[in-house]
A protein has these predicted regions:
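Membrane-helix boundary elements
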Residues: 41-82
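Hydrophobic alpha-helical transmembrane segments of polytopic
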Residues: 30-40, 88, 117-125, 144
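Cytoplasmic juxtamembrane regions at transmembrane-helix boundaries
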Residues: 99-120
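Membrane-water interface at the C-terminal end of transmembrane alpha helices
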Residues: 150-164
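Membrane-helix boundary connector in multi-pass membrane proteins
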Residues: 127-144
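Membrane-interface helix-boundary signature
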Residues: 23-34, 74-84, 111-115, 137, ...
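Alpha-helical transmembrane segments of helical membrane proteins, especially in multi-pass transport
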Residues: 84-102
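Cytosolic juxtamembrane helix and N-cap/initiation of the first transmembrane helix
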Residues: 17-49
Length: 164
């Protein structure tokens, strides 16, 4: 399965990517930045799964400026909110893990497809999530999104020569 997945990802690489010299690879600083940011996404996702009460209090503080508001919604509603947080967390664990491996293998090797995979996935998450947050009046989540976006935007900008 892993070999098959690597072959699929490898098809994104162009002949130009294969001919890149080691000098055209991103610096270790930026690769490490991507790795830490990706691990942070996965860790945050895991926190959403394993610490439901902490997660509810955190999002309650973020949205309502009070740690107990979400828990006052009623038992069934709180259970459902915890489920949604856990599902979101699981997706974030998967996405963060994938980003980590793309950065460690493709991007670190100077393969431009690695840069594009990271950039496209971050933008594909950021735009709809942030747009809905703003349209629904939850600007606080948009601010949280902006912080996560910046974790990837900075090294993407620094390594933008690899995007071709």
């Amino acid at each position: 399965m892993v070999a098959h997945s690597a072959a699929i990802i490898g098809t994104f690489a162009t002949q130009r990517d294969a001919a890149m010299t080691p000098g055209s690879r991103p610096s270790k600083f930026w690769i490490n930045w991507f790795l830490v940011a990706s691990a942070g996404v996965a860790a945050f996702g895991l926190l959403l799964v394993v610490a439901p009460a902490f997660t509810r209090r955190g999002f309650s503080m973020l949205v309502y400026a009070s740690p107990g508001d979400i828990d006052s919604f009623g038992a069934e509603q709180v259970r459902y909110i915890s489920l949604v947080h856990a599902v979101l967390g699981g997706v974030m664990v998967g996405w963060g893990t994938a980003l980590f491996h793309v950065a460690r293998s493709l991007l670190a090797g100077g393969v431009s497809a690695g840069w594009r995979i990271i950039a496209v996935s971050v933008v594909a998450w950021f735009v709809p999530d942030t747009a809905y947050s703003l349209l629904s009046g939850f600007w606080q989540n948009a601010l949280l999104n902006a912080a996560f976006f910046a974790l990837f935007a900075v090294p993407l900008w620094a390594t933008r020569d690899l995007r071709r």
